[in-house]
UniProtKB/Swiss-Prot annotation:
Lineage: Bacteria, Pseudomonadati, Pseudomonadota, Gammaproteobacteria, Pseudomonadales
EC numbers on record: 2.3.2.6
Full protein name: Leucyl/phenylalanyl-tRNA--protein transferase
Native source organism of the sequence: Pseudomonas aeruginosa (strain LESB58)
Protein family per UniProt: Belongs to the L/F-transferase family.
Disulfides per UniProt: none
Length: 226
């Protein structure tokens, strides 16, 4: 049975209560209060819903993750990085990045990054929890991504690209930065060919929960310097 959250209770049900179909649906309702969002990621779930739906909270099994030491950079991408076609920055324009991620795409019907979602994550950014990666070409924003940093874990949310390899360059730059700071895992949530080509793989929900328990409160071992 699906758990419905109240606006005053920030506790989520155990992850093993998530539905098998649809895979990983854990709870519905509640709100996008910053405290609830932080509690969700610490617990191992995330919001994902369309306009007109209640807020839906997910913890899929398996979970797609990337371990920084397993990052795969293809020859063509390595060449692109060496050519320095792009400038990559952190936290220069979070709002522009999340708005670009929310923009309609040819292969998708609508967007799950609703206006309330954008405002909620912008608030997390102001609190130093959510971060953006911007990829620039000739002073134009051509790619980027955003996510949350907690302890030695990074929770990726969405990325976009307006130029060939732009989002990949931003992602690789972020992963290398996180690796140098001692991060142990990047949560990619759901599988895509794009992410698998960069080294992401699936682990069980239980294994993901173990990483959460161990690393969500550990400070980075290196200079994060976002």
């Amino acid at each position: 049975m699906l758990t419905w959250l109240s606006r005053t209770d920030f506790d989520f049900p155990p992850l093993d209560k998530a539905l098998q179909e649809p895979n990983g649906l854990l709870a519905a309702g509640g709100d996008l209060n910053p405290q609830r969002l932080v509690a969700a990621y610490r617990h191992g779930c995330f919001p994902w819903y369309q306009d007109g739906q209640p807020i839906l909270w997910w913890s899929p099994d398996p979970r797609t993750v990337l371990f920084p030491d397993e990052l795969h950079v293809s020859r063509s991408l390595a060449k692109c990085l060496r050519q320095q076609r792009f400038e990559v920055t952190f936290n220069r324009d979070f709002r522009a990045v999340i708005q670009a991620c929310a923009a309609p795409r040819d292969y998708a019907d609508g967007t799950w990054i609703t206006t309330p979602m954008q405002l909620a994550y912008q608030e997390l950014h102001l609190r130093g929890i959510a971060h953006s990666v911007e990829v620039w070409q000739e002073r134009q924003l051509v790619g980027g991504l955003y996510g949350l940093a907690m302890g030695r874990l990074f929770f990726g949310e969405s990325m976009f690209s307006r130029a060939d390899n732009a989002s990949k360059v931003g992602f690789v730059t972020l992963v290398r930065h996180l690796r140098d700071a001692g991060f142990v895992l990047i949560d990619c949530q759901m599988p895509t060919r794009h992410l698998h080509s960069l080294g992401a793989r699936a682990i069980s929900r239980g294994e993901f929960a173990d990483y959460l328990q161990r690393y969500r409160d550990q400070p980075p071992t290196g200079d994060l310097d976002f």
